[in-house]
Design a protein with these regions (language model features):
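Conserved functional loop/turn residues at catalytic and ligand-binding sites
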Residues: 29, 34, 124, 163, ...
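Conserved SAM/AdoMet-binding glycine-rich loop
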Residues: 58-161
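Alpha-helix N-cap and loop-to-helix initiation/capping positions
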Residues: 41-44, 48, 78, 82, ...
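Short microdomains enriched in Cys/His and/or Lys/Arg
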Residues: 47-61
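Conserved small/polar residues in nucleotide/adenosyl-binding loops
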Residues: 212-218
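Canonical Radical SAM [4Fe-4S] cluster-binding loop centered on the CxxxCxxC motif
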Residues: 6-51
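Conserved C-terminal portion of the radical SAM core fold
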Residues: 127, 150-210
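Residue-level marker for beta-strand->alpha-helix junctions and adjacent short loops that shape enzyme
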Residues: 75, 107, 135, 173-175, ...
Length: 220
């Protein structure tokens, strides 16, 4: 099995089998992010994905795999029926797997019905990692996140109603010096409203290859 480009995963998925079901990120225009800039987004075919799962299942370590992470940036953009086929194959080929995880954007979560999400949970999708970044809509607009804080909250609450755990990440310093208080308070309010199983802050680092030339406002 060959990965396409650099593959990213959450720290807690360090021991997971990583399977690329999509390449890159469908949005891919966040001003702070360079993770998928070298990739043209596409959804991999079921044949490709199932071939990878079958190939790895012959590895002598396969019986010890307990977690699978569906990469790249937003696996939930896939059709639910295709995801169900993938989840079924995972549990058929890797009977020791206890949890399947993926990244998920608020847009993708909201596009799926609760019935679809429940079916995914019943098929083994245990946790979705959601990058909220901030709870302040001005900041979200500035970084070209593509969603509002209210949409992210709604997506998190929807996952909770469907029994899927949520791990939400926010970015420390994203508002710059001039919006330190607004960023901090809005993040706290967002976490409270979402009530995720896990919440963590990441450190901001800017890259020249980001989609926009993001500069943080500072106090004069």
């Amino acid at each position: 099995m060959d990965y396409e480009g650099i593959v990213y995963r959450p720290p807690s998925e360090a021991r997971s089998l990583i399977i690329q079901v999509t390449i890159g990120c469908a949005h891919n225009t966040c001003g702070f992010c360079n993770m998928y800039k070298e990739k043209k987004f596409r959804i991999r075919s079921l044949a490709e994905i199932l071939a990878d799962l079958t190939e790895v299942s012959h590895n002598p370590y396969a019986p010890y795999i307990e977690k699978v992470f569906l990469a790249d940036g937003d696996a939930l953009v896939m059709k639910t029926e295709d995801l169900l086929v993938i989840l079924d194959a995972i549990h058929r080929l890797y009977p020791g797997v206890k949890r399947v995880a993926s990244y998920g954007t608020a847009q993708d979560i909201l596009r799926k019905s609760e019935e679809e999400l429940i079916r995914l949970r019943e098929a083994g999708l245990g946790i979705v990692y959601v990058g909220a970044e901030s709870g302040d809509n001005e900041i979200l607009k500035y970084i070209n996140k593509g969603v509002t804080a209210e949409q992210t909250i709604e997506a998190g609450q929807k996952l909770k109603r469907c029994g899927i755990a949520t791990s939400v990440t926010l970015i420390s310093g994203l508002g710059g010096r001039s919006k330190v208080e607004e960023h901090a308070l809005s993040c706290a309010k967002l976490i409270t409203a979402m009530n995720p199983e896990y919440a963590s802050f990441l450190t901001l680092r800017l890259y020249a290859v980001s989609y926009t030339h993001l500069t943080l406002p500072t106090i004069a």
